[in-house]
């Protein structure tokens, strides 16, 4: 139904509201957090080995907000491997989470890697052209060498692929094993100055930008 006059009543539990094609969040219990996942934390809700998991950061946030219903549960959106740190979302917005993880909506992700050895000029070109891995070809959209020397280099890489450990495998394939890796951007979102272990709720503008990215 298209509404052209103010004052029309809607039920946010059964109706979806859109403005200029973008979904408008009307449920205050829909929460999406940005987490700076520390290295060593497992991206899972429960770990049989007893290692720290990202689920604890969601529980901590909810514990700090007793006004929210006890039934709320924040789930990780996608994953980062255990030794990778950086930007990870925790959310109870099922539709947004589903689209962010769906292969047809692969959004750009930017990582900063500290690698072994000095990166030669051919390496970024090779990564952009594509590398054949055991599960198919992988290529970067953009590669920037931030610093390079015999003792190690800093490489920023942006790509759309969501394959497991893809950045580590690509850099290893060109002779530069990763010693530290952090995701700094996810689509329109930037990690900014969020410190490891910290969380913050996404702003309305950030939610709207994510929705636009995945066609909501």
PLM regions and their residue ranges:
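Basic, flexible Lys/Arg- and Gly-enriched helix-loop patches that mediate nucleic-acid binding at interfaces
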Residues: 1-216
């Amino acid at each position: 139904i298209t509404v052209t006059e103010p004052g029309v009543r809607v039920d946010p539990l059964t109706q979806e509201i859109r403005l200029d094609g973008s979904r408008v969040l009307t449920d205050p219990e829909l929460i999406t957090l940005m987490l700076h996942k520390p290295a060593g934390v497992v991206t899972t809700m429960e770990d049989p080995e007893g290692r720290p998991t990202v689920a604890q950061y969601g529980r901590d946030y909810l514990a700090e907000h007793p006004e929210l219903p006890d039934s709320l549960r924040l789930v990780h959106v996608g994953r980062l491997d255990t030794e990778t740190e950086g930007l990870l979302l925790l959310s109870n917005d099922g539709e947004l989470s589903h689209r962010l993880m769906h292969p047809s909506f692969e959004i750009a992700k930017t990582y900063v890697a500290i690698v072994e050895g000095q990166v030669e000029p051919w390496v970024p070109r090779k990564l952009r052209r594509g590398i054949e891995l055991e599960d198919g070809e992988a290529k970067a959209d953009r590669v920037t060498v931030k610093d390079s020397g015999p003792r190690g280099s800093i490489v920023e890489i942006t790509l759309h692929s969501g394959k497991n450990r893809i950045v580590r495998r690509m850099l290893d394939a060109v002779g530069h094993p990763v010693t530290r890796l952090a995701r700094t951007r996810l689509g329109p979102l930037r990690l900014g100055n969020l410190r490891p272990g910290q969380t913050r709720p996404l702003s309305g503008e950030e939610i709207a930008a994510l929705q636009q990215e995945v066609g909501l």
